[in-house]
């Protein structure tokens, strides 16, 4: 190795020297951050409780702290402001809990009352602040928070504080000066009466619970989760309710027990299926809509009418022994005699139902007009469809009332389209086809 290479070695270490000086300057700035509050003599040491008004609110109601097997953090969090330490000296901050009285507590009739002798005291557990040890300047530059301390009712170690449930405790802060085996000494021990609490496994006072939720940001997250859960339950309850409106009106199940034959007066106003065999379909009767939308397009304010035959039509289940339904001509009343307030502009009789053996088929009025007969098709379950309106208006018609008429038409009378408030076209109306008895085959009810 030449002398020239030996002369270059000191210059190679200059970057390291610059790095060390940079680190030392960072440490010095850290120490000087809280030096303005310092006192090398420690004679003016002051310790004040942070968030004292919040603690006072809890203390007025007798504060409660949850203890669990795995440990639960405190709220409010114990925070203190410290001043008067030696900025260049090293200190450790410790926390323990002492019994506030000599009896056990119980919650009776909305208040805490003494409930007997206390349990034997357990060995006092001490919590060491994770920043310990550190310079006095470090402890004085910002509030010292004990947010990570956990309270438990089981002696499991791990730096947790074990407490007896239903006993009242008071936190106690210790400041110890460190720096060598011979220099350790207790600087101060301080307590705050407003931080007393009763250890519980579940909150007893609802007002304490409300304060915890109001001021604890983590408890607010719990409250939001609970509200979402309640809302979901409410949606599930709504989803569990029968939803038949989207089926388009009539819903006839093709499985399950068959209902007995309905009353021969098929269209009586008060007719309903027998309760002894059709209880399982009671909700369908309550939720189904009218099978025939109204054919009129209203051009003036509606007139109130109390007559509605849609609610009186019974639900007709399929049956193997039914060959047809006898319907007389006087039962097929024109819809102009029974207007009701609706804004539907669909066709008159958008679909009709024919019952033959096990098939119930919807057929449009146009198909009936052209063929004069009912078709067969969809088995068991049916969805009502709509067809375009073949008529612009309904002419005035007069329906005679006879003694043999069905009870539903006992109050039938002549109704004029002008009187009812419905507009009519000046063009001649299209011919209408009325359903007569020859469109239906005789029915023989099965023997019971």
UniProtKB/Swiss-Prot annotation:
It holds the Pfam family T-box. The keyword Zinc-finger does not apply. It is found in: Nucleus. Involved in the transcriptional regulation of genes required for mesoderm formation and differentiation. GO terms for molecular function: DNA-binding transcription factor activity, RNA polymerase II-specific; RNA polymerase II cis-regulatory region sequence-specific DNA binding. Its main location: nucleus. The keyword Transcription regulation applies. Residues 290-312, 401-448 are annotated as: Disordered. Residues 417-442 have a biased composition (Polar residues). GO terms for biological process: cell fate specification; heart morphogenesis; mesoderm formation; positive regulation of DNA-templated transcription; regulation of transcription by RNA polymerase II. This is T-box transcription factor T homolog 1. Residues 54-224 bind DNA. Keywords: Developmental protein, DNA-binding, Nucleus, Transcription, Transcription regulation. GO terms for cellular component: chromatin; nucleus.
């Amino acid at each position: 190795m030449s002398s020239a290479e030996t002369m270059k070695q000191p210059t190679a270490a200059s970057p390291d020297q610059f790095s060390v000086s940079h680190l030392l300057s960072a440490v010095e700035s850290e120490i000087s951050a809280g030096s303005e509050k310092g006192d090398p003599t420690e004679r003016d040491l002051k310790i004040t409780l942070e968030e004292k008004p919040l603690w006072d609110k809890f203390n007025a109601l007798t504060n409660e702290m949850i203890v669990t097997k795995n440990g639960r953090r405190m709220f409010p969090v114990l925070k203190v402001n410290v001043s008067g330490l030696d900025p260049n000296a090293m200190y450790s901050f410790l926390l323990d809990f002492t019994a506030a009285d000599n009896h056990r507590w119980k919650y009776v009739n909305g208040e805490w009352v003494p409930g007997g002798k206390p349990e034997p005291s357990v060995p006092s557990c001490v919590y060491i602040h994770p920043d310990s040890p550190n310079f006095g300047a470090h402890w004085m530059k910002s509030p010292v928070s004990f947010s990570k301390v956990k309270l438990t009712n089981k002696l499991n170690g791990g730096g947790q504080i074990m407490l007896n449930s239903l006993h009242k405790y008071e936190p106690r802060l210790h400041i110890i000066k460190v720096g060598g085996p011979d220099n350790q000494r207790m600087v101060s021990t301080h307590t705050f009466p407003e931080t007393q609490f009763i250890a519980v496994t579940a909150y007893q006072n609802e007002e304490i619970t409300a304060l915890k939720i109001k001021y604890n940001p983590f408890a607010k997250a719990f409250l939001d989760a609970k509200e979402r859960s309640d809302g979901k339950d409410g949606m599930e309850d709504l989803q569990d309710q029968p939803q038949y409106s989207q089926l388009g009106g009539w819903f006839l199940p093709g499985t399950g027990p068959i209902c007995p034959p309905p009353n021969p007066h098929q269209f009586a106003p008060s007719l309903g299926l027998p309760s002894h065999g059709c209880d399982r379909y009671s909700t369908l009767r309550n939720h189904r809509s009218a099978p025939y939308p109204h054919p009129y397009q209203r051009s003036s304010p509606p007139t109130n009418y109390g007559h509605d035959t849609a609610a009186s039509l019974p639900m007709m289940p399929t049956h193997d022994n039914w060959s047809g339904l006898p319907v007389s001509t006087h039962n097929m009343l024109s819809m102009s005699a029974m207007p009701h307030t609706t804004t539907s502009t669909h066709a008159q009789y958008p679909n009709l139902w024919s019952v033959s053996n096990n098939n119930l088929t919807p057929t449009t009025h146009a198909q009936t007009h052209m063929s004069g007969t009912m078709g067969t098709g969809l088995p068991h379950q049916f969805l009502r469809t709509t067809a375009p309106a073949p008529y612009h208006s309904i002419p005035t018609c007069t329906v005679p009332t006879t003694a043999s008429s069905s009870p539903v038409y006992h109050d039938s009378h002549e109704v004029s389209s002008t009187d009812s408030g419905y507009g009519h076209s000046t063009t001649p109306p299209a011919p209408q086809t009325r359903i007569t008895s020859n469109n239906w085959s005789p029915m023989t009810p099965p023997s019971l």
